[in-house]
């Protein structure tokens, strides 16, 4: 799920703006990864990567690389838009996995896909306005965070049916738990210990038990691409001011997208460098 969340400039033709700076460039990437466009919905694109018998079972790992390339492409377009005095595009991307074939409804000759992964990716790509206002100044290198509020002020870190989770996803890629588990089946993920310079405000939202995992994704024509995954606990916050209370036992997963992080990868040529 790819969602455009930036306001349009007054007087601009929205259709032309989306087509030129988002839809057309993304369509070229979809062809590269043999991905299908399920449908357009307002300011969003729903994309599917299907696994077929006889093909390499790498749908999630290649979806991660596709999402990374989309964000990289948008960063380049945003530089041009900024120089032209036009509003920049901001995306939130979500990757969900369903371990079964999708169903289809027929509308004449047109197939309409029915899949739980569509709704899940929509949720993963979302960004709560209040959370964005709170976290945006302190997001740092990471682009995805998840907060939880509860009706029970004495919550001990567990989860209940009353809990509400809210996402921060600005220029990020959020991975569902089933997608993360499928990714671990597709490629080997190794722990990566690295210390980045962060302000005290940025560190506050970083889980001290969080992990960074790095893996290599095989692509077409013998190419490979490194990806980094951040695994973090969900933060329990005070509903009144979104101040951090404690860390819960829930997890969320981010496909790291910041070029500075990939530039720090040891050894092999990083994904960021390969885009130059």
Model-found features: residue ranges?
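Catalytic NTP-binding/metal-coordinating core of nucleotidyl cyclase/transferase enzymes
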Residues: 1-65
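Short regulatory "switch" loops immediately downstream of catalytic or recognition motifs
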Residues: 3-6, 48-52, 75-76, 125-136
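Short secondary-structure boundary/capping segments
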Residues: 11, 108-112, 190
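Acidic, metal/cofactor-coordinating or nucleic-acid-engaging core segments within structured domains
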Residues: 16, 24-28, 62-83, 129-161
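Catalytic core of nucleotidyl cyclases, primarily class III adenylyl/guanylyl cyclases
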Residues: 32-59, 78-115
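Alpha-helical scaffolding flanking metal-ion-dependent phosphate/phosphodiester catalytic sites
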Residues: 95-97, 117-130
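Intrinsically disordered, glycine/charged-rich C-terminal tails and inter-domain linkers
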Residues: 129-276
């Amino acid at each position: 799920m790819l969602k455009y969340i930036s306001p349009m400039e007054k007087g601009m033709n929205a259709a032309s703006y989306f087509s030129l700076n988002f839809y057309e460039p993304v369509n070229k990437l979809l062809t590269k990864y043999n991905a299908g466009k399920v449908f357009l919905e307002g300011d969003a694109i729903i994309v599917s990567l299907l696994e077929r018998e006889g093909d390499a079972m790498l749908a999630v790992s290649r979806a991660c690389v596709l999402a990374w390339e989309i964000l990289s492409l948008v960063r380049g377009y945003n530089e041009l838009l900024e120089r032209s005095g036009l509003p920049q595009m901001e995306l939130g991307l979500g990757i969900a996995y369903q371990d079964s074939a999708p169903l289809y409804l027929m509308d004449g000759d047109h197939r309409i896909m029915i899949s739980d992964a569509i709704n899940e990716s929509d949720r993963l790509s979302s960004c709560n306005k209040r959370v964005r206002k709170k976290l945006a100044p302190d997001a740092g290198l990471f682009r995805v965070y998840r907060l939880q509020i509860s009706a029970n002020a004495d919550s001990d870190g567990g989860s209940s049916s009353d809990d509400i989770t809210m996402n921060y996803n600005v220029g990020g890629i959020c991975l569902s738990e089933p997608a993360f588990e499928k990714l671990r089946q597709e490629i080997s993920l190794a722990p990566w210990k690295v210390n980045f310079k962060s302000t005290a405000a940025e560190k506050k939202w970083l889980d001290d038990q969080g992990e960074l995992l790095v893996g290599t994704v095989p692509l077409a024509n013998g190419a490979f691409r490194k990806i980094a995954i951040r695994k973090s606990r969900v933060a329990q916050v005070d509903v009144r001011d979104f101040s951090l209370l404690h860390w819960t036992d829930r997890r969320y997963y981010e496909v790291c997208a910041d070029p500075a992080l990939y530039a720090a990868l040891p050894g092999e040529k990083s994904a960021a460098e390969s885009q130059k």
